[in-house]
Amino acid sequence: MKRFALSVALPLLFVLFALAAIVHVTGPGWSMWGGETDSGPQVPRAPAPPAGSLSIPVEGVARAALADGWRVSPSSRHGHHAIDIPAPAGTPVLAVADGRIEKLSEGERGGAAIYERSRDGGTIYFYAHLDHYAPALAEGQAVSAGQVIAAVGTTGDAEAGAPHLHFEVHRMAPGEAWWQGREVNPYPLLKGAG
């Protein structure tokens, strides 16, 4: 029995010492879930909008039809930090809040996309896989909640047979540009309590 206990205990102790050494060497600024972490001073960010405070960004879609698509991968910083709202191609995409068009972009992943900055500057709303922008939509243009800004599509890496709006929300610190900020799950902001 003693021999069995030693054959189990010794390898277990070795593993524990090895883990302790790794933690000691890597220090507090490392995370096994996402690589390097920011151990510097935290920059204050704008508070997220209250739950249910945003307009639904696709015309004709009810709050009850929304599904939470937020996924975070425990092994990396990647995941799906958005909500996908399926709709027929060409369905109007609406601004979720009053704001200003910060950037119109065309990319491999998001395809035709819009970055809208909230009126207070503390939030970016990202609309992707758009078929096209609304006529005369331009960077710097003020938009109102519910205003048509684009149409649902399948541009970028969206599946050709599955048109949808990919919608993200990013909380911004003062001075951060449109591509920065911290992702916030948009589902509760759109869905709300009812």
Task: Put a short name on every predicted segment.
Residues V23-A112, A145, T154, E183-G194:
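Surface-exposed, glycine-biased beta-strand/turn segments
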Residues M1-V15:
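N-terminal Sec-pathway targeting helices
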Residues T123, Q141-G194:
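Conserved, short, structured surface segments that act as functional micro-motifs
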Residues V96-E139, A162-H166:
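Zn2+-dependent peptidoglycan hydrolase active-site motif and core
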Residues V72-S73, P92, E106-R109, G121-T123, ...:
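Solvent-exposed loop/turn segments at secondary-structure junctions
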Residues P57-E59, S76-R77, E108, D120, ...:
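Extracellular/periplasmic catalytic domains that process cell-envelope and extracellular macromolecules
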Residues P11-G29:
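Hydrophobic alpha-helical membrane-insertion segments, chiefly the h-region
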Residues P86, R117-R119, H170-M172:
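A generic structural motif
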